[in-house]
Amino acid sequence: MLHTPLFELCREAGGRMVPFAGWEMAVQFEGLMAEHRAVRQRCGVFDISHMGVLTLTGSGVKDKLQGLVPSDLQRIGPGEAQYTVLLNEAGGIRDDLIVYDRSDTEVVVVINAACADSDTAWIKQQLEPQGVSVSDRKAGGVLLALQGPEAVGRLERLCGESLAGVPRFGHRDLTIKGEPVFAARTGYTGEDGFELLLTASAGQSLWRQLLEDGVAPCGLGARDSLRLEAAMHLYGNDMDANTSPLECGLGWLVHLEMPIEFVGREALERQTAEGVSRKLVGLQLQGRAIARHDYPVLHNGEPVGVVTSGTFSPTLEHPVALASVRADLAKLGNELMVEIRGRQEPAVVVKRPFYRRQG
């Protein structure tokens, strides 16, 4: 089992450690509900050092990476980032990732821990013959997610400069206690905040400082409930290698107007012309039962889809779920049933996200 540089500090902070994608990670500290509310109301910090961080370097690196993703990377420049997906030839999703444009010759990508090895091998296979160098920038480093309404203010006090000019999906190099920090205004919670890449020792020091200052340490459990309230996708649940962006609510990432070939383009063009047979929807459960991954979704007693993710929403105080259902049943307001432990529970198709922060 792999350990991040913050493993012992997470245990010291009361973290309950569990296996996750080959790593031993904290699933919770004080408790999921308390951590969830801390991020929604104040500020929380997550150890996400298990995620893959690759640095791609070489002449025209962004143009070469363009052939692997369906999103137009020419829309971003240095200091900006794009959320996108890697596709296979059938248009299925290999992984979702964020592409950070550092310069004309350098791009940083952050990928999921469970897909990191396969993503890295495939990206190398595709890009190294084109003269792109692919390296694991993380290499024992720390990746922290500082999230919540107070996150930006706390980071400003630590680095001694205003971050008001950094837009959502923008990034900047900072210095904290003399140590370089790559800071991106991104996150997986539906709140404002930054994700911070730094060395192991600097990351350990920053973790201690944040906890001493009253920031709540948060685990994978709260990370999942927060992202689900914000209707953010989880790879392996809400999308996978057999699901295209058009089928899982990520069609906005697909820019077919680009006169550029990319892996999976032909399949997506065909789906666009013919339409899709299934769509991802948000469900609000009418009772208190919680729908979980792979629970059947029914209409008039017939199976019409499956739940991809589900939880009890601490903010909304009722169960919510994402589900892949027959396309003709994806209309807002449609009433469906979810089979939960042998009982059919009523649910209604609602607008995503379930929660949207104010301001």
Swiss-Prot record:
The keyword Coiled coil does not apply. One of its GO terms (cellular component) is glycine cleavage complex. GO terms for molecular function: aminomethyltransferase activity; transaminase activity. It is an enzyme of class 2 (transferase). Keywords: Aminotransferase, Transferase. It comes from the Bacteria. GO terms for biological process: glycine decarboxylation via glycine cleavage system. Its EC number is 2.1.2.10. It catalyses: N(6)-[(R)-S(8)-aminomethyldihydrolipoyl]-L-lysyl-[protein] + (6S)-5,6,7,8-tetrahydrofolate = N(6)-[(R)-dihydrolipoyl]-L-lysyl-[protein] + (6R)-5,10-methylene-5,6,7,8-tetrahydrofolate + NH4(+). NCBIfam families: gcvT, PRK00389.1. The glycine cleavage system catalyzes the degradation of glycine. The glycine cleavage system is composed of four proteins: P, T, L and H. Belongs to the GcvT family. This is Aminomethyltransferase. The gene is gcvT.
